[in-house]
Regions:
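Beta-strand-loop-alpha-helix segment that lines the small-molecule cofactor/substrate pocket
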Residues: 1-25
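Glycine/Thr-rich phosphate-binding loops of Rossmann-like dinucleotide-binding domains
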Residues: 4, 59, 161
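A general structural signal for well-ordered alpha-helical segments in protein cores
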Residues: 7, 33, 88-89, 161, ...
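Short helix-capping segments at alpha-helix termini
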Residues: 15-19, 42-44, 123-125
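Predominantly a Rossmann-like dinucleotide-binding segment in NAD(P)-dependent oxidoreductases
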Residues: 27-102
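Short aromatic-enriched loop/helix-cap "lid" or pocket-rim segments at secondary-structure transitions
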Residues: 33-35, 59-64, 115, 142, ...
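Contiguous beta-strand/loop segments that form the cofactor/metal-binding neighborhood of enzyme cores
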Residues: 88-161
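C-terminal helical cap and adjacent loop that interface with cofactors, partners, or active-site loops
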Residues: 170-176
Length: 176
């Protein structure tokens, strides 16, 4: 659902037909995400969450030709944030809760749908940044940075590899 009205409609329909309404954000239900949650403590004080999910839409070429398919119709909640950006934001909220401050920018297409965006979130003692796009590609991973190390997730939408890297000892007198 993309708004409160749709949520109420879905709840009513599930009650009417006696079926279970379930969350569809599959990546947070996987063993790899559970591993991330269980290992956050290894990072020490967490200072940053960064996530990127940019995937050039197979429908964008048609859009550039003037054909607006459903993937770029805002009335269907099919902008980049609602379609794929949510995969970067939802895990962050699950792990760290509601941010104190949000600052966002993006590119709005002629249809009114957002094609891509960047969002900065502020938490107490921590920052988060997410990038998302349906009009460009990226292969950047998701990373959670702490004072004692970091955890990298290869892809936030389908978490395959999770890697913990401990902080390297600081070198005295040479560089950072």
């Amino acid at each position: 659902a993309s708004n409160a009205w749709e949520v109420r409609e879905m709840i009513a329909a599930s009650a009417k037909y006696d079926v279970t309404l379930m969350e569809a954000m599959k990546p947070i239900l996987t063993p790899n995400f559970r591993s991330v949650r269980e290992n956050l403590g290894r990072l020490g004080t967490i200072r940053r969450y960064f996530s990127c999910y940019c995937q050039y839409s197979s429908r964008y070429d048609k859009f550039k030709e003037g054909v607006v398919l459903n993937a770029f119709r805002p009335e269907l909640s099919n902008g980049a944030m609602m379609d794929i950006g949510i995969y970067t934001v939802y895990p962050m909220v699950v792990l760290f809760g509601r941010p104190k401050k949000i600052d966002a920018s993006g590119i709005v297409l002629s249809s009114g749908a957002d094609g891509q965006g960047a969002v900065n979130f502020e938490y107490e003692g921590m920052n988060a940044t997410v990038l998302y796009s349906k009009i460009a590609n990226s292969s950047l991973p998701t990373e959670i940075q702490g004072e004692e190390g970091n955890i990298t997730l290869d892809r936030i939408n389908i978490i395959g590899e999770v890697k913990y890297t401990p902080r390297l000892a600081a070198a005295s007198g040479r560089g950072p």
